[in-house]
Swiss-Prot record:
Record's protein name: Activin receptor type-2A
Glycosylation sites: 43, 66
Recorded family membership: Belongs to the protein kinase superfamily. TKL Ser/Thr protein kinase family. TGFB receptor subfamily.
GO CC terms, sorted: activin receptor complex; plasma membrane
UniProt-listed PANTHER family: ACTIVIN RECEPTOR TYPE-2A (PTHR23255:SF64), TRANSFORMING GROWTH FACTOR-BETA RECEPTOR TYPE I AND II (PTHR23255)
Amino acid sequence: MGAAAKLAFAVFLISCSSGAILGRSETQECIFYNANWERDRTNRTGVESCYGDKDKRRHCFATWKNISSSIDIVKQGCWLDDINCYDRTDCIEKKDSPEVYFCCCEGNMCNERFSYFPEMEVTQPTSNPVTPKPPYYNILLYSLVPLMLVAGIVICAFWVYRHHKMAYPPVLVPTQDPGPPPPSPLLGLKPLQLLEVKARGGFGCVWKAQLLNEYVAVKIFPIQDKQSWQNEYEVYSLPGMKHENILQFIGAEKRGTSVDVDLWLITAFHEKGSLSDFLKANVVSWNELCHIAETMARGLAYLHEDIPGLKDGHKPAISHRDIKSKNVLLKNNLTACIADFGLALKFEAGKSAGDTHGQVGTRRYMAPEVLEGAINFQRDAFLRIDMYAMGLVLWELASRCTAADGPVDEYMLPFVEEIGQHPSLEDMQEVVVHKKKRPVLRDYWQKLAGMAMLCETIEECWDHDAEARLSAGCVGERITQMQRLTNIITTEDIVTVVTVVTNVDFPPKESSL
């Protein structure tokens, strides 16, 4: 009995000590290899130093393909803190016949060698004779089981506490059964790892994620928003949707079991976030305003354009239906790109445009005809609805511009002064439709030639008469013209107009880019 108890206690101490040392990592360097080094502009081979938070563990990883018994290495390098890599000194893939092999390990250069040993189920033969157990066996068993159970609970609790944010271990994308839509070949079966939540909304949330050596955005929809996810995927998959001013699409995925399914949309990641978030924290110069506004207009103009005869097919005209500053993202150089096509309509010849239910989008940005429920269900009518919302976004930009000879307003969404933060549909109908009010264009904005031109353009975008509104192409040309004709030198305290041009002939309203 004494010997059994000592043995059980020793096993318990070993189990607890293994949990106590979690979090240590001795991985400082890993073998580096990138098969796509020319495209990614990296070294092809070398040694990579691993960096990370002190309380995080670091690992090495390797991915490879086995084609006709030939090993083709895809990537090797450092890997982030990952439960699946803990205490693995050898880089071994154990999954049964994966398309792309992936392994991770701990220890310097441990990914120099990698191997594939699939786990196999071992069945015990039933014909073996049962040997009598020694009398102390049951005593030892009864002593060990409770202690091991306690040790297991302690270890599991520690793991859950320390890694509760790592809800998604690294996975190979696309999955074997993504369901409709089909898996995206652009992902190339690369390891994808979620890092942090960047935004939450009615659709779900947006994660910053790592796809090998680059950051991407992963928009995760709950299953009840499947229609929005499906619509975004279909719009992004149309011919000709690769454009500098439209958010870059990478892939769409269906994750989880039939009981608990999440829908993923993977796009390029932009650290500056949305135009709305940027304007909350920053003011903009005249040149910055013009650059953001022009690139936003070019993105919307391209979206609205019907382009036949492209190499990959016919790009139809597309109405966004939810243009707002939250759905305009900014690249590092402040180039704008249009995002979020969950409500978009595509106008393909001979096909239905889809759900043309009138009152969709964000109330604050709804055009008068949408608020009235008096939409003409034709293509041009939907494009003009986008232009009304674009006028409001341009107003947001103007309200944060330092070029005007007056104070810069605190950032506000459109109609906050008139209605407040949470307008009802009835509030919007009263102010926009019946009273025909719009956000205030400050008098001192009009004193500057360029800002005066911008204010005129804004008013023509949000005109109550939908047919009188400017096209996105015309807005882009006007802003280019404004910037060219108005040369402004700004300092911290002075705005000097060097060239003022009046009586300018603007491009026609239906001009396209």
